[in-house]
Amino acid sequence: MGGATEDDVAQISFGYGTFTGALGLHGGLEKIGASVIPMSSGNTNKQIMFLTDMGVTLLVATPSYALHLGEEIRKRGIDPSKDLKVHIGLFGGEGMTEPMRDEMHKVWGDQFVCTQNYGMSELCGPGVAGECTELCGMHVNEDWFIPEIIDAKTEEVLPPGEKGE
């Protein structure tokens, strides 16, 4: 899961309501033996307190909230890339563009591994597709889904191995 291991302390900053991202990632992280802090969403001051005081190594959030947290941490005179242990970001709930990923590295450090996942609360929450640490695009969970990849211009179905949408 994005490079997470049993040695990680994960802070989940997704809501634990009807959005299934929090519970899905919570369960997956516990399954690999990571410690999980179920922060839920909001309360930026408390989020920052836990990030700094609990030795958090992995942040689960939307990419925009991770950037917001980084900005707020910097306002306190703390450099997230040097003063915190966070080295992995598992992001979902919204898309992460390459410029956002570049900004993540500026805020959280060059060694910060940030991957994104895709899910739908109506089906299974997180787990439809996700990036690995190679960051070459998302992998569809083929145990559950059969993807149909099409050419964006012609809308024709592409053969296996071809890139499309």
Predicted regions and their residues:
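Short hydrophobic alpha-helical segments of the AMP-binding
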Residues: 10, 29
